[in-house]
Regions:
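Core beta-strand elements of the Rossmann-like FAD/NAD(P) dinucleotide-binding domain
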Residues: 10-20
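A generic structural motif
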Residues: 4-8
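A conserved short coil-to-beta-strand element within the FAD-binding core of flavoproteins
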Residues: 1
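C-terminal catalytic lobe of FAD-dependent flavoproteins
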Residues: 20, 29-87, 93-179
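Glycine-rich, N-terminal phosphate-binding loop of Rossmann-like dinucleotide-binding domains
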Residues: 25-26
Length: 179
C-alpha cells in the first residue's frame, strides 16, 4: 500500500501510498528491507568498495582505454582517458562499515599505484594523484552454503526480489553501471 517515511529535516513521519514500492538503495537494500543479522545466514548484499584514481592525461597519451586482465593478485586493472584526464582503477575491498561518503583506504591507493607501476613507462606516484573517488558495489551474496567473503568472485549480475507485501528490491550489478 505504500511506505512510512520520515522527513530528514523536520523528523515528521507520514505514510506515502503507492501501488508499487521499489527499493533501489544499493548497499543499504537489506537494511531497508528490515534485514537483521541471523547466525548461519548471509545478508542479501555483500558490499564491496571500488576506488578510482585520477591523473593528468600524459599518464595515458592515447584516446584508447587500456585493460590489463591480470594483476599480481589475479584482478584486473584499467586506465581510461576521461575528460582530459586519466582514470586508473579499480579495487575490490569487502566493507561492513557503510559510510554515505566513503573514502579510499590508504592500502587501496597503494595497491593501485603499485599495480600501475608494473604497466606504465613512467610509474605514477602518490603526488601525481589529482583526485580519488569511491563507489560501494551492492553485490548479491551467493546462496551456496559456505561461500566466503571474496567479493572479487561474486557475480556482478543484477537481482530483482519481490516480497509478498509487494516491495520490489533491485540490487547487485557493477558500480560502473549503477546509473
Amino acid at each position: 500500500e505504500g511506505v512510512r517515511v520520515q522527513d530528514a529535516e523536520s523528523a515528521h513521519e507520514f505514510v506515502v501510498r503507492a501501488g508499487c514500492v521499489i527499493n533501489a538503495t544499493g548497499v543499504w537494500a537489506g537494511k531497508l528491507m528490515g534485514e537483521k543479522p541471523v547466525a548461519g545466514t548471509k545478508p542479501l548484499v555483500a558490499p564491496s568498495q571500488g576506488v578510482h584514481l585520477s591523473f593528468e592525461r600524459r599518464l595515458l597519451p592515447t584516446d584508447s582505454a587500456v585493460f590489463w586482465p591480470k594483476t599480481s593478485d589475479a584482478r584486473v586493472l584499467f586506465a581510461i582517458p576521461w575528460l582530459g584526464k586519466t582514470i586508473v582503477g579499480t579495487t575490490d575491498t569487502p566493507r561492513k562499515d557503510l559510510h554515505e561518503e566513503p573514502r579510499p583506504l590508504a592500502g587501496e591507493v597503494d595497491y593501485l599505484l603499485r599495480e600501475a607501476a608494473n604497466f606504465f613507462a613512467v610509474p605514477p606516484k602518490r603526488e601525481d594523484i589529482l583526485s580519488t573517488w569511491v563507489g560501494l558495489r551492492p553485490l548479491v551474496n551467493p546462496q551456496a552454503a559456505g561461500g566466503g567473503q571474496d567479493t572479487k568472485s561474486i557475480s556482478r549480475e543484477h537481482t530483482v526480489l519481490v516480497r509478498p507485501d509487494g516491495l520490489v528490491t533491485v540490487t547487485g550489478g557493477k558500480w560502473t553501471t549503477y546509473r
